């Protein structure tokens, strides 16, 4: 048995031609805490989403190098690291439901037993104040309590590795220490990697520190060594200023003449595999599969790129039905010219549809998929209304509301954008549940 639960060797990630991570080397012990630091926007979240298997929903996603989890190739594992996404908010259902949803033995427990287990888990997580509020809706809790509960909910499933993305961002300082203490306690039971930007917050998590920039790990050391005496140029700059110069994995050599090379360590050469890229069916930017090759969400064609480029990309991934959720109908002619049928189901921005209308559309989409059609929903950005209807489809097919939202947000954490949409999904589940119960009578 290896001493490491996750081993990355020359691991890289790209989306199409865009290389985000070029050559990451990292070994994660079976138990303990690692803080992942680095400038904003350089791929820390991408690393998490890649090793947790979430980026596979993007048809342009590709990797190279070696990634081993639990001693075997990461791609061969049914179990993956668990992710607590960046800026967790707009959670659904009651406190009780969130605590017990991932319990392996949940189905064998009576309601009273579930309540007893939930209270014990909340106590262990230092969420004592919630033990007598099990029926309260999570969406009504403070942001700090929502983040805390999201980590507990993930830990309840007993994953071997939890990746926590910026848990303290936007929190009141008086709650930060409480949350970090809980993360420290979890790291005594399993491996935990936490992305943080605030160094003072990072220093409260004892363990290892990894500094990621320009597509590779510049430094990986014991926390006190890193904060007191960093060895890399990037580490010294990060401790001094909270950031470090960024040139990217594929840097422009001409641009280097305008930079202070005393502050910069050139990244390793981009591996040959990273450059061996042949364009295939990639889909538009931010296109994501909820069901691979069957059901997807995407932004409005023409919003991110030229409309013909986006429509050609939709055709390449096989989309045959494009459902528009905008208030105003699109011109169907250019869409039809690519062999894609455009359908229109108007929903106001940040709002939710009528329940009966949503049921009709879920029935239609279910029929489309059964007939071999490939369906994509879109609103403007492909997030709120799109995520709501995709989640509704999962509910229509039999998932509980919270399970459906969790499944959708594992693909795109920003799917479902408003309290109105959250409330709709809960009401939609009740309506579908009642409808199918009545049909069974």
Identify what each model region corresponds to.
Residues 253-375, 390-441:
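Cys-dependent protein tyrosine phosphatase-like superfamily
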């Amino acid at each position: 048995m290896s001493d490491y639960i996750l081993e990355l060797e020359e691991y890289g990630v790209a989306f199409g031609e865009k290389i985000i991570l070029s050559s990451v080397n990292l070994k994660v012990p079976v138990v303990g805490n690692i803080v992942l630091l680095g400038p904003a926007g350089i791929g820390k979240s991408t690393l998490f989403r890649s090793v947790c298997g979430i980026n596979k929903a993007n048809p342009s996603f590709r990797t190279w190098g070696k990634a081993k989890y639990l001693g075997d190739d990461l791609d061969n594992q049914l179990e993956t690291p668990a992710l607590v996404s960046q800026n967790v908010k707009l959670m659904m259902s009651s406190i009780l439901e969130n605590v017990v949803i991932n319990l392996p033995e949940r189905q064998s427990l009576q309601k009273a037993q579930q309540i007893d287990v939930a209270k014990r888990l909340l106590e262990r997580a230092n969420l004592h104040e919630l033990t007598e509020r099990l029926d309260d809706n999570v969406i009504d809790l403070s942001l700090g309590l929502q983040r805390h509960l999201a980590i507990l909910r993930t830990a309840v499933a007993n994953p071997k590795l939890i990746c926590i993305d910026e848990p303290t961002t936007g929190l009141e300082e008086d709650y930060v220490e409480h949350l970090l203490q809980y993360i420290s306690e979890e790291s005594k039971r399993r491996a935990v990697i936490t992305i943080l930007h605030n160094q003072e917050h990072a220093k409260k998590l004892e363990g290892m520190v990894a500094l990621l920039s320009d597509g590779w790990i510049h430094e990986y050391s014991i926390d006190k060594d890193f904060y007191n005496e960093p060895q890399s140029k990037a580490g010294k700059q990060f401790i001094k200023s909270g950031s470090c110069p960024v040139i990217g994995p594929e840097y422009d050599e001409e641009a280097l003449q305008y930079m202070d090379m005393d502050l910069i360590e050139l990244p390793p050469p981009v591996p040959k595999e990273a450059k061996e890229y042949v364009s295939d069916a990639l889909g538009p930017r931010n296109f994501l599969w909820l069901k691979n090759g069957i059901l997807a969400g995407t932004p409005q064609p023409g919003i991110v790129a030229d409309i013909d480029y986006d429509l050609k990309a939709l055709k390449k991934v096989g989309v045959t039905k494009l459902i528009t959720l905008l208030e105003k109908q699109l011109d169907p002619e250019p869409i039809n010219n690519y062999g894609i049928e455009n359908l229109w189901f108007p929903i106001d921005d940040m709002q939710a549809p009528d329940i009966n209308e949503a049921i009709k559309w879920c029935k239609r989409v279910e029929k489309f998929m059964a007939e071999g059609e490939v369906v994509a929903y879109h609103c403007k950005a492909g997030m709120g209304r799109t995520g709501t209807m995709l989640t509704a489809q999962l509910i229509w097919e039999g998932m509980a509301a919270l399970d459906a939202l969790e499944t959708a947000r594992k693909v795109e954490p920003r799917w479902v954008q408003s309290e109105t949409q959250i409330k709709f999904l809960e009401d939609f589940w009740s309506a579908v549940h009642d409808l199918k119960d009545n049909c069974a009578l």
